[in-house]
């Protein structure tokens, strides 16, 4: 009997069977079909489960979405019991019968940037937790950079991230937030990238298997693709060895919380490497973004890990 691998999203499939109907979201549509095709070679079924499919207990959901033609899904109204779930929506229910890619402890860690900063102290820019305007005095005392980055604790994709001058911190900020030292990355990385950047390492079973280099649009500082940044992918042999050495103890810190697949973002400042943050449910590249075989190799390693987890 075939094993079932499911990806769960906290969003709806529309009446046309589309999960991501916008053209600019092509990556998020196609990557799921790429995963389906890769897993099919290993005799594993892929299904999509969304918040439209209620959990009924004992590891079962009522209804699921079967990949169809033209990157659309067909609704199936029957019970399904996935053998393994990749949670892209932060499922907050479990009766002990659901088997997740990453543990719940790891998912909670992914939702709290301050907890990540405490765990990665010494690897991450100087960080302060700010719960009210009274916390600004602590920020100015501990962070010396002229510019200061403010981030919500639980958002990704550059959403809610703001850059302030230290003399003009926003009194209308929503709390709690973290505030961090701003690290200038315009010096780039020899042999890899010129100018401002961040580098994302994709971690599978404790190993950095691929990286992406993202750069902001001209004049910008946020490199997230939804913020107008560009992205290119590289296989492990192309990753800067200094970064791999710097990243290894960081990976070990996060692995102890039960992460099987995740990403960590890094940057190189004028005085060395820094971790930015960990993402417990990173966006995955689709085959159409592959220019050098790195994405195909990533999918094969991901499928191998899924196969091992289902054995």
Task: Label the model's feature ranges.
Residues 200-201, 263-265:
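Short, surface-exposed charged micro-motifs
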Residues 23-131:
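Conserved N-proximal alpha/beta basic substrate-recognition cap immediately N-terminal to
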Residues 241, 255-261, 268-311:
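C-terminal active-site "lid" helix and adjoining low-complexity regulatory extension at the edge
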């Amino acid at each position: 009997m075939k094993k079932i691998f499911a990806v769960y999203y906290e969003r709806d499939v529309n009446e046309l069977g589309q999960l991501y109907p916008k053209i600019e979201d092509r990556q998020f549509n196609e990557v799921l079909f790429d995963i389906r095709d890769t897993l099919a070679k290993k005799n594993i079924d892929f299904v999509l489960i969304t918040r439209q499919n209620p959990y009924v207990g004992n590891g079962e959901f009522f209804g699921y979405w079967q990949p169809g033609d033209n990157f659309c899904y067909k609704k199936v109204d029957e019970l399904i019991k996935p053998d393994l779930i990749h949670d892209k929506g932060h499922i907050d229910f479990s009766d002990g019968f659901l088997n997740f890619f990453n543990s719940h402890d790891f998912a909670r860690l992914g939702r709290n940037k301050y907890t990540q900063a405490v765990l990665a102290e010494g690897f991450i820019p100087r960080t302060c937790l700010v719960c009210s305007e009274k916390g600004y005095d602590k920020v100015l005392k501990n962070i010396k950079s002229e510019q200061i980055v403010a981030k919500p604790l639980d958002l990704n994709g550059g959403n809610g991230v703001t850059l302030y001058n230290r003399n003009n911190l926003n009194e209308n900020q929503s709390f709690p937030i973290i505030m961090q030292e701003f690290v200038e990355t315009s010096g780039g990385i020899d042999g890899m990238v010129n100018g401002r950047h961040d580098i994302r390492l994709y971690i599978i079973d404790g190993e950095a298997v691929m990286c992406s280099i993202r750069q902001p649009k001209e004049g910008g500082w946020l490199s997230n693709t939804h913020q107008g940044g560009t992205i290119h992918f590289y296989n492990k042999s192309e990753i800067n060895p200094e970064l791999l050495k710097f990243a290894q103890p960081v990976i070990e810190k996060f692995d102890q919380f039960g992460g099987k697949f995740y990403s960590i973002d890094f940057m190189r400042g004028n005085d060395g490497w820094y971790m930015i943050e960990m993402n417990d449910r990173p966006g995955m590249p689709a085959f159409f973004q592959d220019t050098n075989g790195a994405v195909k190799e990533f999918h094969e390693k991901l499928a191998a890990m899924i196969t091992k987890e289902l054995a």
